[in-house]
């Protein structure tokens, strides 16, 4: 309904479909994307929001020295090698995986980006200072910048 009202009130250059990875969200997103196509509004791409939670940490031995090697495993599903500094990175897919990719393939448009769950993104947004402005060199800012650059390129800007 909102998509239809938008297309009736203003001329859109294109639409970006934003979804989360789980199936229930995708069913609603499909309806909206299909409606944009019916009213001849180009779908420029898909963005997957809440696309995994990245956990980074350091593993220490009983004497508080970083482990030089090893393995971290969570729920037998997520695992990561411990590097020589004792650090590891795990990406946990809380809301499934690949929904944005599947929808972009269905529509024949690019997956513009995957925005992870992040305390950093949430805190900066809640403070009214989006991370792209407050910390432009942050890796999360780069995700947003890449999305914007792809959209601008598609629109000829």
Question: What residue spans do the PLM features occupy?
Answer:
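Short, amphipathic alpha-helical "lid/cap" segments that border enzyme active or binding sites
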Residues: 137-148
């Amino acid at each position: 309904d909102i998509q239809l009202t938008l297309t009736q009130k203003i001329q859109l250059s294109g639409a970006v479909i934003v979804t989360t990875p789980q199936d229930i969200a995708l069913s609603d997103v499909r309806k909206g994307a299909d409606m944009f196509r019916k009213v001849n509004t180009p779908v420029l791409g898909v963005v997957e929001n809440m696309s995994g939670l990245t956990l980074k940490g350091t593993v220490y031995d009983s004497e508080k020295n970083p482990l030089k090697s090893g393995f971290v495993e969570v729920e037998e599903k997520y695992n990561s090698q411990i590097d020589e500094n004792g650090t590891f990175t795990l990406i946990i897919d809380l809301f499934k995986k690949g929904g944005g990719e599947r929808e972009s393939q269905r529509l024949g448009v690019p997956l513009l980006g995957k925005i992870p769950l992040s305390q950093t993104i949430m805190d900066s947004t809640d403070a009214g200072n989006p991370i792209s402005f407050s910390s432009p060199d942050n890796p999360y800012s780069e995700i947003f910048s890449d999305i914007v650059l792809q959209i601008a390129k598609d629109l000829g800007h």
